[in-house]
Amino acid sequence: MEMVNKIACFVLLCMVVVAPHAEALTCGQVTSTLAPCLPYLMNRGPLGGCCGGVKGLLGQAQTTVDRQAACACLKSAASSFTDLDLGKAASLPSTCNVNIPYKISPSTDCSKVQ
């Protein structure tokens, strides 16, 4: 019986060590996914492929950590582009018929995003 317990512990240890470590979305992933939105959000072009990017980001942000990381990146981007139309940014989810759990705005508290 002791040998069975040792084998079970070894198998459990291997499962923990080998399990993939999930990492939050990076700002690079978020910005590349939403790059098609920039012309639209800066009043320089049509909506084009923007909604595909918004829907793609929604699909990538499956966990709370991912959603908070995406929120922080979008918040930072919204603050850094001086000619970004914040009204268009805030309405982007409804324009693209998607539901995200936060407003795209420099004032969003990303720590509260679930």
From Swiss-Prot:
Biological-process GO terms, alphabetical: lipid transport
Domain of life: Eukaryota
Protein family: Belongs to the plant LTP family.
GO molecular function: lipid binding
Keywords of this entry: Disulfide bond, Lipid-binding, Signal, Transport
Segment forming the signal sequence: 1-23
Disulfide bonds listed in the record: C27-C73, C37-C50, C51-C96, C71-C110
Function: Plant non-specific lipid-transfer proteins transfer phospholipids as well as galactolipids across membranes. May play a role in wax or cutin deposition in the cell walls of expanding epidermal cells and certain secretory tissues.
Family annotation (PANTHER family): NON-SPECIFIC LIPID-TRANSFER PROTEIN 2-RELATED
Name the record gives this protein: Non-specific lipid-transfer protein 2
InterPro entries: Bifun_inhib/LTP/seed_sf, Bifunc_inhib/LTP/seed_store, Plant_nsLTP
Pfam families attached to this UniProt entry: Tryp_alpha_amyl
